[in-house]
C-alpha cells in the first residue's frame, strides 16, 4: 500500500467543488493509498530528521462532511512513499523553510511532488525567462524609469508583483493613464522590490488558458478563464468565468516545448498560463483547475498524476 502525505491549507475551509488537492485525495483513496494529512505547522526538523504530526484521513464527495481524521501520529517523513506539497502561495520564507524540511525526507527516498529544490528555483513569473521566445515582451525591474520607458514603447502594458496569486495586484496601464507612477511605486515599494511588466495581450478577451502538464505530458484539455464585466484579469479568484476547452495547436507546441524541462526538474504537476499563443506564467506551487476540466471532458487528470507518481516510485 502506498503511503501518501499531503501538505495543504486547512482542509476544513476548502471548496471541494473546485479544489484540486481534494480531487487528488479522492483518486489516491480510490486506489487504496493510506492518506496522511499535514499543515505547515505540523512539519518539523529534529537533529536533521524531517518529521511531522500527521493525521490519517478519509475523504468523500459530500458537501456537508468531506473529510474525516481517522488517527493521529508523529512520524518520520521518510516513512511515507510520496508527499504532495500543495500549500498555496504566498511563496515566502516560511514556504522555503518547509521545502528544506521536505528535502531532508526526499534525500532519504520519499518522492516530493513537486521537487523542493525546483519549487525554490522556479519562480512562477520569472521561470518564463528561460523560454523568452514563447512569452510576451517582458521586463523585470525595480526601476520606475525603465517601467515608464517600457510603457511608452508599448503604450498598453500589464504590471504585476513576482509573488502574487489569483490575479492579486495585477494592473493594466493604457496609453495616457496618469496612474503609472503611483502603480510603479506601489508594486516596487519605491524601488525596493522587483516587479514584472509585459505588453498587454488583446487575446485575453478570449481567455487566460490554464494548461496542465503531468510529469512532462500535457493534459489534452485546458481551462480558459475569461475576464468578466470589463475586468482585465481572467483568474477565477478575480471573478473570471471558466470554460474548459481542448488544447489548440499553439498550446500543444508550448506545452511540449516546456514539458521535458519540467520533467527533468521533478516538477510533476504544473500549470502553464497561456494567453493567445504566448506563455505568461509557469505555476509550480499548487496548480489548480483539475475539477473544472474533469467535469467537462472524459479525462482523469488525477489518474494521470497518480500513474506518474506510481511510475516514479517503481524506478
Swiss-Prot record:
Bound cofactor: record note: Binds 1 magnesium or manganese ion per subunit.
Species the sequence originates in: Citrobacter rodentium
Family: Belongs to the prokaryotic GSH synthase family.
Residues at which Mg(2+) binds: 281, 283
ATP-grasp domain sequence ranges: 125-310
Cofactor(s) needed by this chain: Mg(2+); Mn(2+)
Keyword field contains Transmembrane helix: no
Reaction it catalyzes: gamma-L-glutamyl-L-cysteine + glycine + ATP = glutathione + ADP + phosphate + H(+)
Protein name (record): Glutathione synthetase
Entry keywords, A to Z: ATP-binding, Glutathione biosynthesis, Glycoprotein, Ligase, Magnesium, Manganese, Metal-binding, Nucleotide-binding
Entry's Gene Ontology molecular function annotations: ATP binding; glutathione synthase activity; metal ion binding
Pathway noted in the entry: Sulfur metabolism; glutathione biosynthesis; glutathione from L-cysteine and L-glutamate: step 2/2
Amino acid at each position: 500500500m502506498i503511503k501518501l502525505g499531503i501538505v495543504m491549507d486547512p482542509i476544513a475551509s476548502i471548496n471541494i467543488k473546485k479544489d484540486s488537492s481534494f480531487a487528488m485525495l479522492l483518486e489516491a483513496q480510490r486506489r487504496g493509498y493510506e492518506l496522511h494529512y499535514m499543515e505547515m505547522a505540523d512539519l518539523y526538523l529534529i537533529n536533521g530528521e524531517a518529521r511531522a504530526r500527521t493525521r490519517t484521513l478519509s475523504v468523500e464527495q459530500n458537501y456537508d462532511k468531506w473529510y474525516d481524521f481517522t488517527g493521529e501520529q508523529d512520524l518520520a517523513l521518510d516513512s511515507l512513499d510520496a508527499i504532495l506539497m500543495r500549500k498555496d502561495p504566498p511563496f515566502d520564507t516560511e514556504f522555503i523553510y518547509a521545502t528544506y524540511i521536505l528535502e531532508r525526507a526526499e534525500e532519504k527516498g520519499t518522492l516530493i511532488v513537486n521537487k523542493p529544490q525546483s519549487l525554490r528555483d522556479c519562480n512562477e513569473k520569472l521561470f518564463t525567462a528561460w523560454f523568452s521566445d514563447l512569452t510576451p515582451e517582458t521586463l523585470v525591474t525595480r526601476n520606475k524609469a525603465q517601467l515608464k520607458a517600457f510603457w511608452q514603447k508599448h503604450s498598453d502594458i500589464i504590471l504585476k508583483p513576482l509573488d502574487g496569486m489569483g490575479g492579486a495586484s495585477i494592473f493594466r496601464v493604457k496609453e495616457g493613464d496618469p496612474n503609472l507612477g503611483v502603480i510603479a511605486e506601489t508594486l516596487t515599494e519605491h524601488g525596493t522590490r522587483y516587479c514584472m511588466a509585459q505588453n498587454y495581450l488583446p487575446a485575453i478577451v478570449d481567455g487566460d488558458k490554464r494548461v496542465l502538464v503531468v510529469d512532462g505530458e500535457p493534459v489534452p484539455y485546458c481551462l480558459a478563464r475569461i475576464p468578466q464585466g470589463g475586468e482585465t484579469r481572467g483568474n477565477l479568484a478575480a471573478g473570471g468565468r471558466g470554460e474548459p476547452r481542448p488544447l489548440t495547436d499553439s498550446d500543444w507546441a508550448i506545452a511540449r516545448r516546456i514539458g521535458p524541462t519540467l520533467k527533468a526538474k521533478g516538477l510533476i504537476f504544473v500549470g502553464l498560463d497561456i494567453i493567445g499563443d504566448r506563455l505568461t506564467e509557469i505555476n509550480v506551487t499548487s496548480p489548480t483547475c483539475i475539477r473544472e476540466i474533469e467535469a467537462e471532458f472524459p479525462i482523469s487528470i488525477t489518474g494521470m498524476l497518480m500513474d506518474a507518481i506510481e511510475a516514479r516510485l517503481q524506478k
